[in-house]
Amino acid sequence: MYKIGKYFLLFTFVFSFTQCARRSTPTGGLKDTLPPEMINASPKMNTIFFDKEKITITFDEFIKLKDTSNQLIISPPLELKQYKIKPQGTVSKKIQIELLDSLVEGTTYTFNFGESIIDNNEGNPLPFFRYAMSTGPIIDSLEIRGKITDAYERITAPYTSIHLYPIDSTFSDSTIFLKKPFYATSTLDSVVYNFKTLPPDPYDIIA
C-alpha cells in the first residue's frame, strides 16, 4: 500500500509539471519598423583621392538588395561591366561594390541606392542612401534644395522622386524618356527635396 501511494504521488508531480510546461508558450516581440543603419564605410564617406578597387558599407543588421537595376543610380553613370555589387539574392550585413574598371580622374562619384536597401526581417527600406567619394582633391559641393507643389491636387503626395539631368551637348527633350537620371532623390514624407555633392553645371529637374 505504501509503495502504491508513493508512485501515485510521483506520477501526479510529473504530470502536473508537464502540463505547466505546455501552457508556457513564448510570445513574439514588437514588429521591427526601423530601416537599417550604416555603421561604417571603407573607404569612409566623402573620401578624396579615391584609388581603391572595392567599397565596403557595413550596416547594423542583415540587409538585402532589391531591384538595383532600377533603383541604383551611379553618377556619373557606369556601365554594368564596370562594377559588381553584393549581396545579390542573399543576405549580408555588408554591401560590397567592386570596381572593375578605372574611374575618371578628378571626378566626384555618387552611388544612390534609391529604396533598394531593405532589412532582412520586415523589408523596411533605407530610403535614398548615398555613398560619395572623389578621385580628385575635392568633393563636389553644389547643393540644390526645393519644394514641390501638385499643380492639380490640393494636397501634394509625399515620397515623390525628383530627377536631375545635366544640360549638355547631348541633352534633348527626349533624354528624360531614354536615359536614367544622373541624380535622384525623394521628398520622403514631406514635400521638400535636397540634392548634394553636385558639380556646378546647369540641370533639367523632373518630378
Could you say what each language-model-derived stretch is?
Residues 1-18:
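Sec-dependent bacterial lipoprotein signal peptides
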Residues 4, 20-206:
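Acidic, low-complexity Ser/Thr/Gly/Pro-rich repeat segments typical of extracellular/periplasmic
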